Regions:
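Alpha/beta-hydrolase fold nucleophile elbow
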Residues: 197-208
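Catalytic-loop region of hydrolases
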Residues: 2-9, 20-152, 275-277, 402-403, ...
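Conserved alpha/beta-hydrolase "acid-adjacent" motif
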Residues: 426-431
Length: 523
């Protein structure tokens, strides 16, 4: 989950005939549930080539209330269970977004051999995305140039931009746009279940995929077996309310870094208290308001660079970086590389305006002054890490279409699953995961002291992987609240140690962030 303006992508929808099988389900959707899934070698560009991975398409109605109003194609991928005698069904996956391509998710579980023995792992591009029938959205220039500390007069620029995004997506999306939604994607998942001949599916969803999984379970409780919601959203809050949680998490990570650095004043010389360390950042930012300083071209670049404090393993190098600027040794090439690495590790723009359609399911304030007041508050108190942009109006502030339906109340009438969240994740903060776990009355795995987003099968976290695998394979849940140590570990720099003695912090910050960016690419 991250506020992004999706890139334009154009593709004509494809349509196929439906063929019945023995897995019939009565009703007007019978032909969709009983279609034959023709697995074959994946077309070039769908997924990274790998032995045993197949692809197919499933046909779904654009509008489930009026199935005669046109069809959409949903692209799916499969890695079959390696031990057919022990096979217990399919494991459907979603990477989040909204709008993330999930065909390649079948590769994420390659190291989880126990899971691969018993499940067919299924990836999918949700409706509107990638190799499925794409939603059209006319391209809009990026908002990357917007300042991190806008003047009052500049606040309206966000509204103008958001209006243009909404207008372009509405023109490009046409009738299909109203039907690209969490609820319809959940219905597509149930059609996939039926078409595969399964009575139930198990599920692993990340980020927004946790909301999708919770909605799927609410709409189709008899169809859901085991479920893992990793980096969960808060099912009781609107998208904008969760943006507030994101800003709070960014601020909390910054605070923790100042505490860590203050405890090592003898190493970095940035102050013996968190307030003193924060004052060093403020001093750099103040100089940047007047012009280039410390290698940075402007204060906006520096503000976003401070967002690196979410990653614990970057703390030592970031402290060293700030100390070098304080000493007058700022390097423009390093500063540019830091910003580039953070952008590379950020979430890719989601496909074809899907994000801009799905997020409009939530209620949004329509009075722009509500956003402007929040933007000014964060600009004046804590602008580091891009907080102001999270508070800005979005295209949904100016939504041009009427929602066909609201998100249903999240309920659980299916077997208990798992929620996984970390206490440093800024995209889906731990507070969101706590609410999801409490609302569903399921166990929560807290990944401690870790700023990464998405954990199971992605971070080589033996504790998380073992607990989730045990549940998925054997149905054994952990205690209601479990803590696993994170893998995003701050370097052990004892107080008083000279910075030059630190092996990791001797590496450039940009190099460390570049490694993190590669690891983060699933999102």
């Amino acid at each position: 989950m991250r506020k992004r303006w999706g890139a334009a992508a154009l593709a004509a929808p494809l349509f196929m005939s439906l063929v019945g099988t023995a897995h019939a389900e009565p009703g007007p959707l019978d032909e969709y549930y009983t279609q034959t899934v023709a697995w074959a070698e994946c077309p070039a560009g769908w997924v990274t080539p790998s032995t045993g991975v197949e692809c197919a398409t499933v046909i779904v109605p654009m509008d489930y209330k009026n199935p005669g109003n046109g069809n959409l194609e949903i692209a799916i991928s499969r890695k079959k269970a390696t031990d057919p005698a022990r096979r217990r069904g399919v494991l459907l996956t979603n990477p989040g977004g909204p709008g993330g391509s999930g065909l390649g998710a079948v590769h994420w579980f390659n190291a989880q051999t126990d899971v691969l023995r018993v499940y067919d792992v299924i990836g999918m591009d949700p409706r509107g995305v990638g190799r499925s029938t794409q939603l059209r959205c006319i391209s809009t220039p990026s908002d990357d140039a917007f300042p991190s500390r806008p003047t009052d007069a500049q606040l309206s620029n966000w509204s103008e931009y958001a209006r243009s995004v909404e207008a372009n997506c509405e023109r490009g999306g046409g009738e299909m746009r109203r039907f690209v939604s969490t609820m319809n994607t959940a219905r597509d998942m149930d059609v996939i279940r039926g078409a595969l001949g399964e009575k139930k599916v198990s599920y692993v969803g990340y980020s927004y995929g946790t909301q999708l999984g919770a909605v799927f379970g609410s709409l189709f409780p008899k169809s859901l077996d085991r479920s893992v919601l990793d980096s969960a959203l808060d099912p009781l809050k609107t998208w904008h309310e969760q943006d507030v949680d994101v800003v709070d998490a960014i601020t909390d990570n910054l605070r923790k870094w100042t505490e860590w650095t203050a405890a090592r004043n003898g190493t970095y010389g940035l102050g013996a208290t968190p307030a003193a360390v924060r004052a060093e950042l403020d001093a750099i930012a103040e100089k940047l308001k007047a012009g280039p300083h410390g290698g940075y071209a402007d204060v906006t670049s520096f503000d976003y660079a401070v967002g690196a404090t979410r990653y614990r393993r970057s703390w030592a190098a970031f402290s060293r970086h700030i100390a070098s600027i304080k000493a007058g040794a700022g390097d423009p090439a390093e500063a540019s590389a830091i910003v580039a690495a953070l952008k590379k590790g950020d979430i890719e723009p989601t496909s074809a305006g899907t994000y801009q359609a799905v997020t409009c399911e939530w209620d949004w304030f329509t009075d722009v002054n509500t956003y402007y007041n929040d933007m000014k508050r964060w600009r004046d108190t804590q602008p580091y890490g891009g907080t102001v942009d999270y508070m800005a109006p979005t295209n949904c502030t100016f939504r041009a279409f009427k929602r066909p339906e609201k998100i249903p109340a999240i309920t659980r009438k299916y077997p208990a699953g798992l929620v996984v969240n970390s206490d440093g994740d800024t995209q889906t903060p731990l507070a969101n995961g706590r609410v999801m776990a409490e609302h569903l009355n399921v166990p929560l795995i807290n990944v401690a002291n870790d700023g990464q987003h998405g954990h199971y099968a992605l971070r080589r976290n033996a504790c998380v992987d073992a607990l989730v695998n045990k549940y998925l394979v054997s149905g054994i849940l952990p205690a209601s609240r479990v803590t696993c140590a994170g893998t995003d570990i701050a370097e052990n720099v004892p107080p008083g140690q000279a910075a030059s003695m630190s092996v990791q912090s001797a590496r450039p910050l940009s190099e460390i962030l570049g490694e993190i960016a590669v690891e983060t690419k699933p999102f």
